[in-house]
C-alpha cells in the first residue's frame, strides 16, 4: 500500500515538477499545528547513513545498473530500511529556496537537498532543527549531471522518482501524507544552527557529495572577484515548451562577445523581478541578443514583434553572476522571486576594485560550482 500511495503522489507531482525557481510565499501562516517531536531512539529501526555514505551508495548503485552516464535521469529507489539525519541549514523566508531545504550531518560534512515540495517551509522546518529522513520508498537522484568532456557532476538530492525521467531523475514529494511518513522533525527547542565552513579551494568538475565535503554544505568563500559575466535563460513565452530553441534566449558571455555586448548583458542585479526584466528589456541593452540557441537564430530582440511578445509575456528570471576565486569560478545563482532579486551589485565590485566574501549553499551543476544565497546579508563587500 505504501508503494502505491507513493506512486500516485509521484504521478500527481508530474503536473508541477520543475527545477525552475517559482514564486514563494514568504509571509507567515497561522501558527503550525503542534507535533510530537521525533525520538530516534524509539523510532529508528534501520541503519542511519551519513550523507556522504548515502551519496557513495547512490554512485555505486548507478554503476551496478550501468547508469553512470545517465545520472541526469536515473535514480535509485530505496527499498531498504535506511535513514539519514541532519540539521536544517536553509530557509525559504527570503524566497531564494523553492519547495526544499538542505541538511548537513555536521559542520564538516556535505549536505543534501530534501525535495519536500511545500512552500513556506520556514514556518515548520527551522534552521538548526534536527530532522530524520526515512529513505525506504524515496528516490535518490542527481540534479545537474552532464555527460561528456564538457560536462561534469551535479548534486545528489532526495525526493520521489520522477514519473517521466526525461529531464530530471527526481520530483518533489509534495503529498503531506507521504511527507509525514518520511520527514521527521525533532524538538524545535533544540535548535543548533550549523556554522558556515570556510573553504579556500573549490570542488572539481567530477565531484559531488560522494567525493567532496563542500558540496551541499553551508560554506563561506572570501576574495571573490567579479568576472563581468552573467547567465540568464529567457523564454519568449513562458507558457510554451521551455526546451524549444525558438522559445529560448541565451544571455551568455559567449553570445555577448559575438555581438559586442557587455559580458553580463548589462545585468547588474543579483536576479530580476518582472519589473526589473522589463526595465532591462526596454533599455535596449539586449537588442542584439537573438532568439534561439547555438546556430539557430529566429530574430534579434530589437525586432518590434519579438520585443512586444517579450513585454506581453514578461516574467521574473533567475540569474547566475560569475565570480573568480578559490582557484576557480563560482556562479552565484539567485531566483527572480527572491526578496533581493533586484538588489544592485555594488559598483566597486562590478568594476573589480573590491572583492566579496560570500556565504551560501555550494552546489554542483554540470561540473560547475554554484552558490545559493540564503539572504542578502550573505554577501559582504571587502
What positions do the PLM features span?
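Positively charged n-region of N-terminal signal peptides that target proteins for export
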Residues: 1-4
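C-terminal motif of bacterial Sec signal peptides marking the signal peptidase cleavage site
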Residues: 14-17
